[in-house]
Structure formats: C-alpha cells, structure tokens
Amino acid sequence: EIVAMKSLIASDKFQNSKMELPIALGKTISNESLIADLTKMPHLLMAGATGQGKSVGLNAILVSLIYKKHPSQVKFVLIDPKKVELTIYNKIERHFLAKLPDEEEAIITDTTKVVNTLNSLCVEMEARYELLKEAMVRTIKEYNHKFVQRKLNPEKGHKYMPYIVLVIDEFADLIMTAGKEVETPVARIAQLARAVGIHLIIATQRPSVNVITGTIKANFPARIAFRVSSKIDSRTILDAGGADQLIGRGDMLFSPGNELIRLQ
C-alpha cells in the first residue's frame, strides 16, 4: 500500500501539531501517522541503499517544514553533491533558502564551496550564541519569545532568529572529496548548534565507519534507516540489526534515540 504524503499532511495530528519544527515521517504498523519534532531530535541521520527512498524521505521532511512554517521562521541550507535531487527547491530560493552573499546558486552542488558554507554556518552559530548570552536566555525559543514581546533592542543587533535546517544529501561523497575539512565543522555544528536553532539532516548511501565517524554518530541520536545491503551496515547506523531485512521502497526503521519504530 502506498502511503501518500497528502494523507500525512492532512492528518489532524500534523495539522494541529504545536511542535516547533514538525516532520511527517510516515505511518506506523498500526496505521497511525507519525509526526516527529526536529527540534527535539536535534539532528537526523538517514541511510539506505540506492533506490530505497532516501531522497523521498528527505523531500517529505522538507515539504512538512515548508507547509507548516512561514519563511521568516525557518531557512534551509541545501547541499546536494548529486546535483539533481534538490534542484526543485530553487523555486523557493527567495523565501526559504539561506545562502552566502557572493553565491549565485542557492543550492550548493559544488563540493569546494561546501567547506565555505559550513564554516560560515559555524560563524553564524557563534554569533547567535553571543546574542543569546546578551539576552540571557538558553534557547532560541526563549530568545524569539523575548524578542516578539519587545524586550530586546534591535539597535544592539538583536533580530528574530529563524531556525536553520542544513540538509546534506550525499554525505559519503563529501567525505570522499573533502574529508576532514567537512567533518570538523559538521561535528562542531552537531555538538553546539541545537540551542541556537541550527539543525542538521544528513543522508548517505553507505553507512560505513569511515563516512559516519564516531564523533558524528555520537551527536546524531535520531536515525532513520532504509533498507541497507548488509547486517554490518544496519549495525553501523542503528546499532542494531534489522535494516537489512526491510522490504525496501520506503520501508524504514526510525530510531528517535532509544526505541525502534517501523514506518512506511
């Protein structure tokens, strides 16, 4: 049975959700819609062999956020080494996509530019921490609440902070071409950025140890596994077997940190 995106978005659970960044992931075995909150995750790691629905899952996540959020509330940074997967999103460039001032393309396909983007995200992260420190709050949610109630002075550099969602479509490809240069900022962002509203979503085909290193893995408690080719791959991503026995085509295991939930 095909689970249509429409049925998830139309579900009461999604329509009435009070989550900060709701994501419609799929339906459970008991046919209930599963809606997760990206801010609670705080970062998401997806893996699966070719043609098992990774890109579809990625699109589902992006569509959920675009549907529920105003462009002032969330911005995306899309990194797409495959060049074609995320190009449909350049239509919303002026609204939803964040980019470096000197770039022409909003969706980064060139691996050499990725390092610049990641480093500038680190800078943005540090700048946001400074603002939080001045506002004497702990999280971006409290900060924006305070700002909306006019308790912070814009002349001192305070501004409404949108969430930033960084999506990397083929992580293995980046590691092959740039290696440590990419890994270090990604690990830094993963460790520190959740309080200032920067969230990572990483998709990769081969969940091998040299791609998903220990540091990265430690900071991604939430994981989604589509069908993978071997039990070893399944263990690498979920720390448990089972992803090698999925049917494929959108059949996935979602692990929000402690349990395994099977979704379609």
Which residues fall in each region the model found?
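Short, charged/polar, Gly/Pro-enriched secondary-structure boundary elements
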Residues: E1-M5
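P-loop NTPase catalytic phosphate-binding loop
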Residues: S7-R138, K156, M161-V228, I232-L246, ...
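Short glycine-rich substrate-engagement loop in P-loop NTPases that contacts/grips substrate
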Residues: V137-V148
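Charged, low-hydrophobicity low-complexity segments
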Residues: Y143-N144, P154-K156
